[in-house]
Amino acid sequence: MDSNKDERAYAQWVIIILHNVGSSPFKIANLGLSWGKLYADGNKDKEVYPSDYNGKTVGPDEKIQINSCGRENASSGTEGSFDIVDPNDGNKTIRHFYWECPWGSKRNTWTPSGSNTKWMVEWSGQNLDSGALGTITVDVLRKGN
């Protein structure tokens, strides 16, 4: 990495680990960014795109990791959202997730919304104070069969 790069935007980041802890698959849908970029695991300089995630199925005991940060040399952080949907129930939304990790702000946002009573979804790890939003783990489980 070029030592002359402005790393401040890279300091605004989030890693979201979606873990299927149940026996039914779910899919990622509608992933989009308002600010920042998505990047490959462990490499903020290797940009990836929403199309790399949208439509991906996460099977039983599988994990998928979504990484996002601000763009280098830009005074912006990262902001985006995505849905997880049930492919066995007409792609009905399980939950909607929104994040914002703004550059130069004292507050971060992590907002899961929506409800699907067939699924249990729990999350932990979000840092709502200034700096990086951090690593958020989301456990997803379809109840029953």
Swiss-Prot record:
Family according to the record: Belongs to the aegerolysin family.
Keyword Lipid metabolism annotated: no
Gene3D superfamilies named in the record: 2.60.270.50
Coiled coil: none
Alphabetical UniProt keywords: Cytolysis, Hemolysis
Positions of the propeptide segment: 1-8
Name under which the protein is recorded: Aegerolysin Aa-Pri1
GO biological process: symbiont-mediated hemolysis of host erythrocyte
Domain of life per record: Eukaryota
